[in-house]
């Protein structure tokens, strides 16, 4: 696929590579990150409808929305659907990289800059939210697992330097 003429879908151009994906089944939207070249400040977050609009194809769909741009290197993302908040890890250079960020899911043009809620990750990668208990978990390529409240308070290091950790998942099993 030729991505040289403003096409936002993944392709050979490193700016177009999709890194993280999250699905909002309630809202019918698919969100993804495109980190761009390393430490270039060219990362972006997009969304589109889960269902391709009638009469369109993946190559010509018109429902792709750019939510955030000029990010260091956005990687993984997750949602707080009740508060319509998008969270993501960013492994680019500080001060805005190696962070966990949050921002409104429904931001439009002129939206405020994303809020940094956690910093000092070592190439931040994985992210999982535990909305019920107001906390999140993050991993980094430095091999550490962290947790904190959704607002960034109550920071904890759960594992330190255990080898490259590239993802994390949180699952709560119902009581029997």
What is each stretch, according to the model?
Residues 21-23, 77-79, 127-129, 168-172:
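Hydrophobic core register within WD40 beta-propeller blades
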Residues 17-19, 41, 70-75, 96, ...:
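Beta-rich catalytic cores
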Residues 39-49, 95-103, 144-147:
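Structural motif
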Residues 26, 35-40, 50, 82, ...:
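Short loop/turn segments immediately following the C-termini of beta-strands
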Residues 26-28, 82-84, 132-134:
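Short coil/turn segments that connect the beta-strands within blades of beta-propeller domains
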Residues 2-4, 9-15, 65-72, 116-122, ...:
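Surface loop/turn motifs at the tips and blade-to-blade linkers of beta-strand repeat domains
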Residues 31-33, 47, 87-89, 102, ...:
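Residue position within the beta-strands of beta-propeller blades
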Residues 141-176:
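Blade-level signature of beta-propeller repeat domains, shared across WD40, Kelch, NHL, RCC1
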